[in-house]
Amino acid sequence: VVIELPPWWRRHPWRSCVLGLFVAALVAGRSVVGSPLTSEVLPPAASSTSQWWDLLFERTHLVGLGSADQAPAYVNILSVLGVPLWFAPGLLTWLLIVLAVPAAALTAHRFGRLISDDRGARMTWAVSYGLLVVVTGAASGGYLGTIIALVLLPLFANILLRLVLEPTWPPAITVGLLIAVVSAFAPVAWPLAMVTLALCAYVARPAARQLAVSAVIGTALLGPWLFDRVLSRRIWWEAGNPVDAPATALQVAGGSGGTIGAASVWIAIPLIVLAVAALVPAPTRRAVTVAWIVAVGGLVVGLTASVSTFAPYPGAPQVRAWAGLGAGIWLAGLMTAVLFAWPMLRTRKYRQWAKPAVALLVIFPILAGGWWVVRGIDDPLQADPVQLVPAFLAAGKGTTVVLTGDSTAGIV
């Protein structure tokens, strides 16, 4: 008797899917190979990891215009992660940005295994979530904070859910560490995390002490850097150089950060339709409602960012905040609502809607994935050094400075 086994890709569908995402990521990154990545937002990487360590311990910053401020909190993380790549730290940012989609899909699939037993829907959900990194425009814009936040968000949700269900100290510490890491790159994640922990403590009273410890750890690790931003009302939205990031309400509702490299808002329409329909089945409505609350919270953050302006430096012109992280959380919540309600399509009452639902479900990853591979992740991201001009200089008109005098009378 000869037993023919199915092909490897059919026996291991998720591994095959991840392999395909890695290949697609390399194809999409074809235009940014060869040099450290830079953009208006993403500063050029240091020539050596030792320069990141210098930022942590030197008394004043001797780069650019010079500064007496302490280094951003994310420099601590980059310094540690860059040790294995000591003489090529630019490779670290390259890996984080180019491979962000498969990385986010992997963490999403891990969380999906906790909340869904439907393999097909879970895989589609994980791939769709991973594509949020490019749909929002975070990858092509060099918004490293949003990329890190979207990659770690499913891991945070996974451990937080386990903490609420089984209150123990190891996951409480892990949650605090994740809050610190994500907030270091995307400071707006800190108030979101505090609100989330407070709501979880209200709902799950037995885990209140562990959740409080998570909040303390996440806040303490950020240290004075966080409180400096609270007291001086400085940049809250994204790591890197503060640049103008205009986004309309329609763009935020479509999951876009409003930058050049963001996808069209129409790609998200099938997802929104499915998320609204997910509210209909009563047996899954409670879980779907929780996902909708998360989604609406992200939408509020995105809309708030789209109308918020700030001066990055004293005397600098106002710039609009980056709304990509809130837009990404908005779509992530909608996707999760669909995943929660998906088992109802196997029941007799909703079985006739299975084919239309599947068609709508696969539209988002097909369109977003195809757009990602064809367009690539360059523009404005590039592999050549960008000449960065301070915002207060770029906003001013060109002037001419005339120097007269000699070595005796002096320069006037």
Describe the role of every protein-language-model region.
Residues 1, 54-61, 214-287, 384:
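Periplasmic/ER-lumenal interhelical loops and adjacent helix-loop junctions
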Residues 29-155, 159-163, 169:
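Active-site lumenal/periplasmic loops and adjacent helix-entry segments of GT-C-fold
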Residues 41-45, 135-147, 242-251, 287-352:
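Membrane-helix boundary/interfacial segments in multi-pass membrane proteins
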Residues 163-181, 208-212:
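Short hydrophobic alpha-helices at membrane interfaces in multi-pass membrane enzymes
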Residues 171-186, 198, 217-220:
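Membrane-interface alpha helices of multi-pass inner-membrane proteins
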Residues 192-219:
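Perimembrane helix-loop-helix junctions
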Residues 342-369:
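Signature aromatic-anchored transmembrane alpha helix within multi-pass, membrane-resident enzymes
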Residues 360-412:
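Extracytoplasmic
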